[in-house]
Amino acid sequence: PYTRIDSINPEDLWNWMDKIREQGIDSIAFPHNSNGSNGQMFEMETFYGEPLSKEYAALRMRNEPIVEMTQVKGTSDTHPLLSPNDEWADFEIMSQRIGSIPPAFSFPGGSYVRDAYVRGLMSNQFGTGNPYKFGLIGASDTHVIGAGLREENYWSKIGLVDADPRARGSIPVADEDRDLVPNRGGVSFQEFEQGSYVIGGLENWGASGLAGAWAEENTRESIFNAFRRKETFATSGPRISVRFFGGYDIDQLSFSDENVIKSAYEVGVPMGGDLLEKETDKAPSFLIWAQRDVNGAPLQRVQIIKGSISRADSTPTEEVYDVACSNGLQVDPMTNRCPDNGARVDIETCAISQNTGSAELKVIWTDPDFDKNDSAFYYIRVLENPTCRWSTWDAIRAGYKPREDLHETIQDRAWSSPIWYTPNDAENPPPIRINAERL
C-alpha cells in the first residue's frame, strides 16, 4: 500500500493509483474528516500552491469520486459560518483540527462539502475543471471494530480512552476520580453547574455514520461500481434510505406506478448524475423518496440543498428548500419551510413523540428558481424528528442533567449524492473577477 511515509502529497497517491489501475487494479480513495482539515481538503490550488487545471480535476475525480460526509469526529456537510441561512447547519460540528494538541480551530472555508461543491462549480466556470464533483458516504471511524451508531447506544470510538461517560465529557468527574480519566496528551477540565467536566473534543464526537449504495446486487463488484458512479448516500447513523432522480421529464412520473423507479432511470439520472442544458427553458424536476429507519425516529421533512454560480457575475447562491413535510403538512411557499409538526423530546426520559412524523416521504419537485445559464448542484437532506443526543442519554442514565454547553437533542439525517446541472457554455469564463471573499 501507498502511505504518507511515501509522500504527504495526495497527488502522488492519485498518480500511484493510476499506475496500479493500468495493471488492472482499480481503487477508490475516500477523503476523510474534511471538517478538521483547516481548509486544506478543498483548496483552490494544488498541494504545492499551483493553479488548478483540468488535468488536476480529472486526476482527483478519477481517484476520489466519493467523500466522507459524516463520521464520529463530526459532520462535514456545512458550518454555520458558511451557511448562516441554514437553520440545520449546526449539526455535530467538530471545530478542531485533526490531531491538534491542545485543540486548535479548523478554518471552515475549504473544510466542508457544500462549500467544496460551490468551489467546484466556480473552478469549472473559469475553465479549470471541477475537482469537487464527488458523491457522498458516511463512515464510523471507530478503532474498536464495532460502531456506536445509535444515540441511545453510543459507547466508544477509541476504546478505553472514551469508553466511560466521564472520559468523554458527558457527565462530571469527581476530584477523587480524575486519575481514572485516561491521559491522552493532556486532559483539561472545565467547571459547569453540576461539576467538573473533561473538555478537549471528545464531547463533540457523534454517533455516526453509515454509507448507502444503490447497487444491482449485493456483490463487491456491483457495490464498487455504485461507488464509482456516485450512486451513494450517507446517514448520521440511522438506516434511512434515500432515492433521488433528476430530469426534464421526471414531472411526468407518478408514485402510483409500481415501476416508478424503473421509469425514473429511463427518463432521468440518479444521484451522482449529470443534467445538461436543454434547448427549451424547462426547469428540471426531481423525484425524491425517503424511508425511515424502523428502529429510529419518524421522518420530519425532506429538503433539497441547491448551490449555483451566476453566469453573469460568478456570484454563488445557496438555497435550502423544504420539499416534503410529515403528517400531510404543506410547505409554506413564502418561506420554503414545513410547519412545525409538533415533535418533542422529554429531556428527563428521552421519550419522543409517538404520534407525529412519517414512515416515508416522497415528492416530485420542480426548481422554482431555475436559470438555464447558471451551473448548479442539488442534493437531498432528510431530517428525522428530534431525539436525545448521546451525551444527554449518558447524563440522564447517571442521574445528571445534560451538560449545558452541549446540544440536548439532535435531528439525525441522511444526505444523497448530488445531481449536477451544467449549461452548454459552462467552461467559457465570463469577463469578471472571482469573488475572492467567498473562497
Residue ranges and their predicted role:
Residues 1-439:
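Extended, charged catalytic domains and RNA/DNA-binding interfaces, predominantly
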